Amino acid sequence: MYGLIHAPLHGEVAYFDVGQGDSILLRTPFNRRISLIDTGGRLAFPQPKWVPATPHSYGATYTNINYLRSRGIDHVDDLYLTHHDADHIGDLPAFLKELRVKRLLVPAGMEQEPQWQHLIRQSRWPTVVQPIRIGSAVPLTVRHPYEAAPAENANSLALQGDFGGLNFLFMGDLDQAGEQKILADHPQLRTDVLKLGHHGSKTASAPAFIQQLRPRWAVISAGHQNRYGHPHAETLATLQAAQVPTVSTQTSGMIRYVYTGNHGRWQTKLKGE
């Protein structure tokens, strides 16, 4: 029984509810391979001088890391960091301190940026930083970026893979210009499950992109009542016009596709349930 609990027979794709951020678990059956796309994290906004400073804490300790430990997971084989924004990689120190992260995969160019490298200094174990781009030999198919550049939204990783009989496409914070590049190179590209770029912002998910991909489902990772108004009404209208069922972490909490073989089921779980 212990072995079954700590090495589950099923696999899963789990979109964590990390507020206004991204973090996605890709776990194959029996925990054979543990991959994550982003860690989540808080965007830092300037505070008035009269606001007292508070000790920094990482939400991941109570959300995605806690979930991994509940599944008997003490390591991460591949941690993909889509770009350098804090809402995607801000909780990286917590992962490096509490779990053995074997490899960090970043968009080509990000490995040269000193601004984020301080985040890896707290790692308890050695970890490899590997820059990737189109054509890189990694478990997921890299759809973007095409060349080394600063790790901003426009150079975000876009990753694709198959799990439980479905094809998944994860867009990070990639914008519409990046979507156009992908379609130009792959005019027949399709996917079953699309994780929308940039939390459902109108800067991503162009109508032509959605129409070409023909996703069966769309997933949005966004914070409840976030200050950006994500997901944007234009994006939701685009999905509705294309008749794409959509689910968001801000209303459904954690979203999971749990699978065995080529069959699976969708589950949602609000915090506190």
Q: Which residue ranges define each predicted feature?
A:
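Non-globular, low-confidence helical/coil segments that flank catalytic cores
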Residues: M1-E273
